Amino acid sequence: VRRTRSDLNEHELYKSDLDSQGIIFPDIEKPKKIFYELDAELDALYDKTMILLSHEKEGIKYLRYQAIKFLKEEKKAKYKNADVASQALAKLMKTLLVKRIDSSFHAFKESLNRFTIATEAMTKMFANGTVYIAPNLNVNEYVMEEREDELLTKMIALQPTDPTIEICSADDFIAGFAEGLQRDFEILTELNKAWQKIEQDPKLDEFIRRLDTELLQKEINPAQKLVVFSESKETTTHIVK
């Protein structure tokens, strides 16, 4: 049974036990919000981005991460729960991007760029007529570096021991998948291009300003220590730099 600090302090039996051990929980103030502002241009880009990341009809379909869902049945049969797994992965990627943009613009730009490259890699595979499905290999890297021959050799060697590996042709996918993937890539390319031009990050600027003028002041922070939590490691690494 889990107990909160309030439970322990309010329950006489628990409280007396804590007192006998000399254990005291400090009183913690409620979190205080720090607001930051976006200029009109950045605000418009942010709103457009949230629509493209989340809108069911107008937005990205995350098809790069749903390839096995759109395989024809004879190929799809080897993957258990293909539809459920694909939808879960697409939802995970959408959630990740939404969380990244609220973590920091730096983290979002890095994630968006990787997603764009990954989607481009799959469009190139379709254009070349061979689509590689190998969850345990970094297919994107091989394709973007034009090392398909090396990838194919490795996949053939691993295929007897790795049942997830599949070498497909464009015809192995149901109609509409390649077109949907291309649509995703075009949206991502435009979005990525817009965000890579953005150098400002009002949230980070406001945090640094508060760090310099307020958060480490002895009046509110006697120990002058601060623990920073973030949704993304790339955000905290960027702050350190």
Kindly give the residue locations of the regions a language model identified.
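Inter-lobe coupling linker of SF2 helicases/translocases
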Residues: 1-146
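Long, low-complexity, polar/charged, intrinsically disordered or flexibly structured peripheral segments
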Residues: 52-75, 156-200, 220
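Conserved interdomain hinge at the start of the Helicase C-terminal
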Residues: 199-231
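Conserved helicase motor "Helicase C" RecA-like lobe of SF1/SF2 P-loop NTPases
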Residues: 232-241
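Conserved phosphate/pyrophosphate-binding and hydrolysis machinery centered on Walker-type P-loop NTPases
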Residues: 83, 87, 91-94, 98, ...
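Amphipathic, well-packed alpha-helical segments that form the structural scaffold of globular domains
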Residues: 102, 186-189, 193, 205-216, ...
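Asp/Glu-centered strand-loop micro-motifs enriched in Gly/Pro and often flanked by an aromatic residue
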Residues: 80-88, 193-197, 212-217
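Non-catalytic helical/coil scaffold and regulatory linker elements
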Residues: 10, 120-179, 186-193
